[in-house]
């Protein structure tokens, strides 16, 4: 799954929160000596890290502070997220995942650009808020590392069949889609009867608070839910029936917008489910036709190898280009001299392709040509090329894009479910020693002292 919550966007959100005018993070400079708040295997979480992360969360709720849980509960929720980041970074490093300085610098440049400033300007803003630039770089490196771990997990374990896409496409063209929210009170694997009873009491208390109008569903989700998307108000996005577990699908069809059902017992614990709104799938999918430009071209490739060094390859491609300029037939030269075994026998014919099919640089050279013209030699990762553009056409890619979007949605749902199980296992296997006080109960419900990486029965998904 290459599409995931965009790494640059997620980092940008984290950074932009730092700049909001709430209780200043620079106050941290005047705090006593830093201390450890959690030991995570061979790593630690420092109080300063926790304070910065809490500051970022609170920045997102300026003007809506009442939706946040009490400070001591929020502290434990955020600490658990930091613990999971430490565990994921450690696992990524064990798996050989490394973030190069070039990749890190590019990500930071993108963050600065999206904040309409330079890297130096970003550095100055961070320092003004009491955050050192090396600490910021490390946090960005960790975010990218976790992204690569998740990406590798998806590529190795997540498969979406064409049959699944066909079924979902048929469902999307008829029927309804449902916008859902949920609240989860987690029950650990192998829970005792006492743990189950405590969870039942907590979910009943949450339902009572909502029914009495003391808290809106969204606020209750932020305050009490054990789901990883609690701080997003438990929003599950839009779901078609095939994306809703069978145990809930029939129930959802009978619900009215605004209705709340539960508590419901699932594999991860007790849930409350709210139907926010319903929309027609066909209307949601409808839209203008999506057209794309495709190009027809031939090319000649001279590879760079241990035996054929850069200078030798460049001299060879220059000679071939001179032959074509002197009147030699492009197809004949390609058959005789191109080192692309996939198409040299066809005179270098690449067929019809979108501009990004062979990389952005290759596509840009093709787009810059007029039909019939031949490019000057240019370099790519594969070697040295000459390209002749033969034609262009407009192709309707609406259906293809719909299938790609549905495939991505299914893959994202599978990834959420599978990765949350992976995080739960990672957390249970780790040595974690918390060195902060347990929060007191709030609203007479068992507090969400720790937000485990529990897989909700309805995992959060990318919204359409």
From Swiss-Prot:
| Enzyme class per UniProt | isomerase
Know anything about its domains from the record?
The PPIase activity resides only in the second parvulin domain. The N-terminal region and the C-terminal tail are necessary and sufficient for the chaperone activity of SurA. The PPIase activity is dispensable for SurA to function as a chaperone. The N-terminal region and the C-terminal tail are also required for porin recognition.
Chief site of localization: periplasm
Q: Name one GO molecular function term.
A: peptidyl-prolyl cis-trans isomerase activity
**What name does UniProt use for this protein?**
Chaperone SurA
Q: What does this protein do?
A: Chaperone involved in the correct folding and assembly of outer membrane proteins. Recognizes specific patterns of aromatic residues and the orientation of their side chains, which are found more frequently in integral outer membrane proteins. May act in both early periplasmic and late outer membrane-associated steps of protein maturation.
Q: Where does this protein come from, organism-wise?
A: Xylella fastidiosa (strain 9a5c)
| Protein keywords | Chaperone, Isomerase, Periplasm, Repeat, Rotamase, Signal
Reactions catalysed, semicolon-separated, are: [protein]-peptidylproline (omega=180) = [protein]-peptidylproline (omega=0)
């Amino acid at each position: 799954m290459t599409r995931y919550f965009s790494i640059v966007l997620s980092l940008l959100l984290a950074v932009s929160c730092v700049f909001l005018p709430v209780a200043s993070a620079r106050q941290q400079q005047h705090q006593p000596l830093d201390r450890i708040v959690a030991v995570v295997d061979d790593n630690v979480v420092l109080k300063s890290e926790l304070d910065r992360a809490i500051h970022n969360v609170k920045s997102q709720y300026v003007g809506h502070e009442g939706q946040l849980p009490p400070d001591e509960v929020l502290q434990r929720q955020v600490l658990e997220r930091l613990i999971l980041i430490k565990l994921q970074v450690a696992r990524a490093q064990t798996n050989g995942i490394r973030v190069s300085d070039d990749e890190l610098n590019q990500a930071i440049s993108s963050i600065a650009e999206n904040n309409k400033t330079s890297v130096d300007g970003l550095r100055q803003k961070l320092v003004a808020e009491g955050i050192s630039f090396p600490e910021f770089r490390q946090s960005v490196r960790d975010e990218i590392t976790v992204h690569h771990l998740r990406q590798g997990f998806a590529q190795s374990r997540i498969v979406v069949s064409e049959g699944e896409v066909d079924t979902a496409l048929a469902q999307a063209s008829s029927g309804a889609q449902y916008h859902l929210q949920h609240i989860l009170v987690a029950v650990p694997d192998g829970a005792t009867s006492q743990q189950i009873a405590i969870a039942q009491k907590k979910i009943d208390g949450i339902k009572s608070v909502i029914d009495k109008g003391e808290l809106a569903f969204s606020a209750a989700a932020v305050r009490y839910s054990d789901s990883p998307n609690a701080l997003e108000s438990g929003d599950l996005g839009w779901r078609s029936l095939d994306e809703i577990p069978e145990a809930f699908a029939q129930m959802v069809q009978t619900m009215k917008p605004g209705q709340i059902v539960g508590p419901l017992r699932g594999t991860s614990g007790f849930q409350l489910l709210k139907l926010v709104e319903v929309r027609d799938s066909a209307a949601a999918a409808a839209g203008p036709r999506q057209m794309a430009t495709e190009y027809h071209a031939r090319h000649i490739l001279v590879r760079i190898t241990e035996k054929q060094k850069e200078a030798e390859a460049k001299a060879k491609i220059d000679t071939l280009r001179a032959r074509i300029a002197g009147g030699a037939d492009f197809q004949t030269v390609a058959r005789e001299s191109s080192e692309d075994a996939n198409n040299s026998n066809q005179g270098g014919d690449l067929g019809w392709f979108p501009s990004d099919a062979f990389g952005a640089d290759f596509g840009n050279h093709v787009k810059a040509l007029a039909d019939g013209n031949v490019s000057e030699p240019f370099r790519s990762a594969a070697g040295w090329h000459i390209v002749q553009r033969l034609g262009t056409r407009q192709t309707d890619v609406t259906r293809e894009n719909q299938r790609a979007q549905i495939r991505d949605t299914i893959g994202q749902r599978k990834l959420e479910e599978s990765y949350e199980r992976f995080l739960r296992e990672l957390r249970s296997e780790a040595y974690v020693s918390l060195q902060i006080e347990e929060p007191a109960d709030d609203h007479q419900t068992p507090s969400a002292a720790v937000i485990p990486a529990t897989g909700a029965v309805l995992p959060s998904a990318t919204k359409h």
